[in-house]
Amino acid sequence: MAVFDVTKLDDAIHGRLRLGIMAYLADAEAADFNELKAVLEATQGNLSIHLRKLEDAGYVEILKSFQGRKPLTRVHITPAGRRAFAGYLDVLSGRSEARR
């Protein structure tokens, strides 16, 4: 039996909240901040920190705008983020050729 190599897990994704963000965006393509906050049952501060980590890794793009006078923050998964998430799932499923 092959030993699972935890070093192949992408640290930018491997965290409960960051994994949840990536899984949600992989299906939805984009979401607004409050939608993610509600779906993931996260606090505003915690979600902001984890989105910044994913943004720094190049896995999500965060766009800020206004809808009338109300600020709107939209989060999109990037092509690099989609590839990284697919590779992460490959590693978890035991496929040795993780996509990068």
Place the predicted regions along the sequence by residue.
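Short beta-strand "wing" residues that participate in macromolecule-binding interfaces
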Residues: 62
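N-terminal helix-turn-helix DNA-binding core of bacterial DNA-binding proteins
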Residues: 5-46, 65-76
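Accessory beta->alpha helical hairpin/"wing" motif in late/C-terminal subdomains of nucleic-acid enzymes
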Residues: 77-81
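Short, hydrophobic-biased segments on the C-terminal half of alpha helices
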Residues: 51-52
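Amphipathic alpha-helical dimerization/coiled-coil segments
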Residues: 1-6, 23-24, 82-100
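Generic serine detector
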Residues: 48, 65, 93-96
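Glycine-centered, phosphate/nucleic-acid-interacting loop/turn motifs that mediate DNA/RNA or nucleotide
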Residues: 58
